[in-house]
């Protein structure tokens, strides 16, 4: 493979402002949506809940629960009883004050891997030009995994997230201002904003 990225989008649903993503998927939207409107257009306006797991004999499995998407009863993963899901609406509302102040505009959002990863990306209003005249945009990314072993990740990135690979590149980048919160902790939006 010589370090090349495999072009796999794994997009379940998405919405985007601006240029059509390379895979041609998603609903095109205007760049003036509120975070909640973007969530709805990206069709990630669903919730998750933990549900007990039982054996065929009716015995409850200790210390484990199914993480279920309530809109269609899809089991997203099996997690521990101390795992705290973050609802998509809470993730999108993280952007509300920045969008309302005019500092950012919602840019892309969606669901990957059948709902196991949800992301929201806002474009920061200020960009800059490189010496050759190329404009560099900056984005603010919120990735909300509904998957055991993955942390909530909030960061600034120069990468426009539109698929699994661009999300992976953003999350693997070093040097970006970022905050990770594990699902065994409570997510406190104001603390994350302070830490950024």
Q: Predicted regions: what is each one?
A:
Residues 1-94, 103:
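Feature for intrinsically disordered/low-complexity regulatory segments and propeptides
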Residues 93-94, 100-196:
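Intrinsic disorder/low-complexity polar-acidic segments
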